[in-house]
Amino acid sequence: MNSTSLYAAIDLGSNSFHMLVVREAAGSIQTLTRIKRKVRLAAGLNNDNHLSAEAMERGWQCLRLFAERLQDIPQPQIRVVATATLRLAVNAGEFIAKAQTILGCPVQVISGEEEARLIYQGVAHTTGGADQRLVVDIGGASTELVTGTGAQTTSLFSLSMGCVTWLERYFSDRNLAQENFDDAEKAARDVLRPVADELRFHGWKVCVGASGTVQALQEIMMAQGMDERITLAKLQQLKQRAIQCGRLEELEIEGLTLERALVFPSGLAILIAIFTELNIQSMTLAGGALREGLVYGMLHLAVDQDIRSRTLRNIQRRFIVDTEQANRVAKLADNFLKQVENAWHIEPISRELLLSACQLHEIGLSVDFKQAPYHAAYLVRHLDLPGYTPAQKKLLATLLLNQTNPVDLSSLHQQNAVPPRVAEQLCRLLRLAILFAGRRRDDLVPEITLQALNENLTLTLPGDWLAHHPLGKELIDQESQWQSYVHWPLDVR
């Protein structure tokens, strides 16, 4: 591989050190290596902000691992940044001097504002959804809060609180008592209060979280079959579960990994304070953050206004999808959706996911015609899809799995991006759009009227269409039968 197409970003965080190595290909990035080590640097800071020798050694040990991988990458294509703990440590110079010797490249201690800006850029490049957003990143020793529209930030804040420092301060006795949480939340709200008005003034339509705490919450909710949106009610529920466990070493929540458990209660307390102080309705997980911001900054790539569209285009190119056919199916599905939207009340994000499934429905053919829906579902489940959340990927895979043949109803109910009933409705529209666009020509798609009454669909075709299209009639009869097996009434006229 040509090393000039390789880029590396290293983030010396207060809780973990991370390395991301990517390859630039045709304006998009392909992840080659992700290495993360829990160093817990912030735990080595004493009251005088002096970093202990043990903490520094843990950091250097990790960097020796990273250094081996960096040897293959040109130095101008490597960026190493240090964040909150090394901003605070009075002896940071000693740590950084040795770190630079180990890595063989400069280490830059970035300001809190620069960290917030880079986090926002990482989110803007990798996360779909509404343009106007609030980004929250809870680190080990600092928390970044950024508002912005598209690629532009409107306010940037880096606050001195993090999951490691709050752990040492409010959970040092390792008790998960109500009082510990109350103290941690009150302190976090006190830190937030001076910046809350400005954040609210700029406003947001969506809120995304870009930290280990939010990742842990996402994993818990996926494991427990909840939908992926983080809400204050869910956070309070998890806090009560943690309090029931009593002690940090006994903390057990389905979906919470051992690796994340130590700083989970402190991160949870900070997040509850943020939700409460800023009156956040819901939050989803960001697709990227600081390291992605560093990489895209080195590549000088503009923020694509529609990340999901860019992702779909890249995948269609990679798997040689017939885009004309994909657009034909999407247009038909959209037409069907408009005809039933008053009866079914399908939200804009569900519409977008249906149209995404239309664009990707034939990627399984790149493996083999036989079992193409299974191949398509497998590919979507395992591909990197910037702009789509893990739950949205699961829904797309489920729709593609059920694009034809008998319906696997349980798979539609196991995804958690949309309610099961909505997943069923999207699946029905996708199947009908694929069926009627099957001859791959616009002039051969009949005029179809679709009406919905509760779950009953009535499909009306031009008068003599069925008589003149015996194969088409057979396919429609078969589809009607498959839908009836799962109690989806389809009446064809």
Curated annotation (Swiss-Prot):
Keywords: Hydrolase
Keyword Calcium attributed: no
Alphabetized Gene3D superfamilies for the sequence: 3.30.420.40, Exopolyphosphatase. Domain 2, Hypothetical protein af1432
Catalytic activities: guanosine 3'-diphosphate 5'-triphosphate + H2O = guanosine 3',5'-bis(diphosphate) + phosphate + H(+)
Biological processes, Gene Ontology terms: guanosine pentaphosphate catabolic process; guanosine tetraphosphate biosynthetic process; nucleobase-containing small molecule interconversion
HAMAP family cross-referenced by the UniProt entry: GppA
Function: Catalyzes the conversion of pppGpp to ppGpp. Guanosine pentaphosphate (pppGpp) is a cytoplasmic signaling molecule which together with ppGpp controls the 'stringent response', an adaptive process that allows bacteria to respond to amino acid starvation, resulting in the coordinated regulation of numerous cellular activities.
Protein name, UniProt field: Guanosine-5'-triphosphate,3'-diphosphate pyrophosphatase
Source organism per UniProt: Salmonella heidelberg (strain SL476)
